Amino acid sequence: MTDRTSARHKRRIRVTIGAAPVMTLDIGAGGFAAELMRVLPVGSKVQGILRIGGADAPYRGEVAWNKPGDARIQMRGRMGVRFTELPPEAAKLLRSPAFSQIG
């Protein structure tokens, strides 16, 4: 979890992981962290759509870390996705310090 190569923004952005919609906890040009009931194993390949700056951006990535939740007490798990493919415009926007103010 500490091998990040880019700054993260504490933003709740709508993304999909496959067909499942989730919200990010934080996001940056290198990837994002999300909270969900069922986490995927580290190393799993994922793809989906980011909704940023009023546009959809497709991505591909890999699960970098996970922390399983506990369904018995309705505690969600968390996982981090490292981008392996991201459109250049989306990466540029996510690197921008102004991203925190963009809807």
What are these regions (language model features)?
Residues 38-45, 92-93:
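Surface-exposed connector loops and short turns at secondary-structure junctions
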Residues 13-17, 43-56:
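Short conserved beta-strand and strand-loop elements enriched in small hydrophobics
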Residues 1-29, 95-103:
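N-terminal helix initiation/capping motif
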Residues 30-36:
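Short alpha-helix capping/helix-loop boundary micro-motifs
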Residues 13, 32, 76-79:
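Short aromatic-glycine-enriched beta-strand elements
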Residues 71-103:
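C-terminal output/interaction extensions
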Residues 26, 38, 63-67, 85:
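A residue-level detector for short acidic-glycine micro-motifs
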Residues 22, 58-69:
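Short beta-strand-centered aromatic/proline hotspots
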